[in-house]
């Protein structure tokens, strides 16, 4: 695997994805983030799960060689955060090792083969929701939620309706 990406974009999706990884598990692979580089689509995809929730995030990348590894969910975002503000290279030079380079900085992290990761089955794209407008939707409706002291729990909620026309 050999990938060239922007540090800020990679840090954003690595931090987001790491939130789904459990702190403890019986399988070492579940504690990590599955990192997959696809040269055909020029995409880098990160996936993490705790068997209840799954976070999968993708970004455009310059992929010279496809491949996948599982990397520690605690170490991967921390290593990226400490890199200088420039392009980042991710490379599996040797089996069981991911090298992260940026400028003069270099990290070598232990990695598992991507085949070891228990990849969750995700629903078809028709059954998923884009979350791009969810933040603004919440921001525009939360003013109507009752303050503390109102005895009725439904008055402290926001109703979201998902239908064929989208999210309302």
Q: Where would I find each of the regions flagged by the language model?
A:
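Structural preference for solvent-exposed beta-strand-turn elements
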Residues: 1-168
